[in-house]
Regions:
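N-terminal nicking endonuclease/strand-transfer module with a His-rich metal-binding environment
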Residues: 1-178
Length: 178
C-alpha cells in the first residue's frame, strides 16, 4: 500500500524547481523584468545526478502524503556585489546549510530592478532543498529513497530526514546561518 501525495500537492517540488530555474512553464515568466543569473544543483542521488528535475518529480511522487517534499527559502543578496560575488556568496551559504549534511538541493539567483525607484538591483537567492540526506552513501531507488527511514536496517528504508530538530537547531535554524 503506497501512501502517495494528494494530486493537489503532488508536483509542488517539481514546480518549485521549474520556477526557480525558469524552465518549462516558467521559461517566459517575468522575462521582461527579472534576470536568471545562475542556477545549480548538487548532492543528488545517483539516479538524479545529471537531471535534478527527476529528483524533484520523484519527491512529489513517492514522499508520504503528509511528508514534506522540499523546503524553499528566498534570501536577499547584497546589491553591491557583482554577479560572480553573488554566486560565490550563495555557494558559501548553501555549502554551510546543505553541504555539510549532504542534502540534495537546487538553487538559482534572480535579479530585477526595484519597482519603487527603477534604479537599484534586487538580487535574491532561491534555495530548494530536501531534508532527505545522501550522507549514508546507500544507493536507493527513487521509490525506496522517499520511504520511511529504517534505523536498524538503513538499506531497507528511505534516506534519513535531517530536520532542523534532528541537527539540533530547531526553529532557530535560519538564525544560525545569519
Amino acid at each position: 500500500h503506497k501512501n502517495l501525495r494528494r494530486d493537489k500537492f503532488r508536483h509542488s517540488s517539481e514546480l518549485g524547481y521549474h520556477y526557480i530555474t525558469r524552465t518549462l512553464y516558467f521559461s517566459t515568466h517575468k522575462q521582461d523584468i527579472e534576470e536568471l543569473e545562475y542556477t545549480a544543483s548538487a548532492n543528488m542521488p545517483i539516479w538524479a545526478a545529471d537531471c535534478p528535475e527527476v529528483f524533484w518529480n520523484a519527491a512529489g511522487e513517492y514522499e508520504s502524503m503528509n511528508g514534506r517534499t522540499s523546503t524553499h527559502i528566498t534570501v536577499a543578496l547584497p546589491k553591491e556585489l557583482d554577479c560572480m560575488q553573488r554566486i560565490e556568496l550563495s555557494n558559501q551559504l548553501i555549502d554551510e546549510f546543505c553541504g555539510q549534511y549532504q542534502m540534495p538541493y537546487s538553487f538559482a539567483i534572480h535579479n530585477h530592478v526595484s519597482t519603487l525607484d527603477g534604479r537599484y538591483e534586487q538580487p535574491h537567492l532561491h534555495l530548494l532543498y530536501s531534508e532527505r540526506s545522501i550522507y549514508d552513501g546507500i544507493e536507493r531507488t527513487p521509490e525506496l529513497y522517499f520511504q520511511r527511514h529504517c534505523p536498524k536496517n538503513p538499506e531497507r528504508g528511505g534516506a534519513k530526514k535531517l530536520t532542523a530538530d534532528v541537527i539540533g537547531l530547531g526553529r532557530h535554524q535560519i538564525n544560525h546561518y545569519r
